[in-house]
Amino acid sequence: MTENIKLTSFAAGGGCACKIPAGQLESAVEGLIGKADPNVLVGLDDGDDAAAVKIQDGLAVISTADFFTPMLNDPYDWGRVAAANALSDVYAMGGTPVTAINLVGWPNEKLGLDVLREVLRGGMDIATEAGISVTGGHSITAPEPLYGMAATGIVAPDKLMRNDAAEPGLPITLTKPIGVGILNNKHKATGEVSQAAVDSMTTLNREAARAAVEAGVRAATDVTGFGLLGHLYKLCRASGIAAELDFSAVPTIEGAKEALAEGFIPGGSRRNLDWVRPHLDTSLSEEELVLLADAQTSGGLLLIGEVPGYPVIGHTTERTGDAFIKA
C-alpha cells in the first residue's frame, strides 16, 4: 500500500537539493562548449535553464531535462512536483511546453511498482494541467528512486527569456516564496507535511511566465537547487551586472523561518551559501543568508523587470566592485 511508504527514507538527498554542488558541476563541464551553430540561441555557455534552437524564422525549440530523488513521502505528490519542476525550465525561457517524456530510476527490490504507478500518475496529471501529453519515457533500475521528465517546448526567438540578457537599473521580481527546501528537510526528519510547500511546488510557472512575456521581460531564470542567491548570482555573472536585494521584501513560505530556527537546514542550502559567499556584500545574519540560499524545488521565476501581481525584491545595478550581490 502506497500510503504507508516513507519515500524520503530511500534517498540520501531530496528534490533539487540533491544536485551536484554548483562549483563542482562548473568544474566538470568547463570548456565543453560543443560545435558552434548559429541556430543555437541558448546552449552550454552560461548554464541557462534550457537549450533553445531556432528551427525556422519565428520559431525555436526549447529542450530540457530534470529529475531527482523524492523530497516528499507521498508518491503522487512527488510525481506532481517533479513534473512541475521539469516544465518550469520551459516557462523560464518564455516558452510553451508541447510534450514531455518520463525519466525513471527505480529500486525494484525495495519499492513496488504500485508506488511507481502513483508517481507517474502525478506527473501525468501535471502534464495534463499544462495542456500537454506524456508521450513516452525511459527507465532503469537504480539504488534510489528517481523521477523527472525531459520536456520540449516552443518559443518565438524575440520573446525568449534568458539568463544573460539582464541590464542594470531594472526591478527584480520573484514569483513564488522561498523556503521549501527547509520545510522539505523538516518533512523528511519528522514526517510533518507543509501543505503550503506542496501547493507551491505543484503550481506551474505558466501564468507567471505569460505575465513576464507580456510585460516585456527578456532576462529570467527559475529558482531551484542553487537557491535564490545562487541563481541570481549566475544571472548577474552571465549578464555582466550586479544586484541589490531587499531581504524584507523576499516572500517566504509559511513555517519556513520557524523550521530554519529549529535547525532543519538541507546540506545543499549550506553548500549553496558557501559557493556564493565570496560574491556577496552583505550585513545579513547567517540565518538570513541560509534562507536566501535555500535549495528550492519547483521554485518561482526570477524576473528582471516588474511584473504585475508579483513582488519586487530588489533591483539590478552596474557592477563596480568584486561583489555581484548586495544584500
List the predicted regions and their residue ranges.
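Glycine-/charge-enriched secondary-structure boundary and capping motifs
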Residues: T2-G13, Q24-S27, G34, N108-S133, ...
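Glycine-rich anion-binding loops of enzyme active sites
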Residues: I55-L72, T96-V193, H315
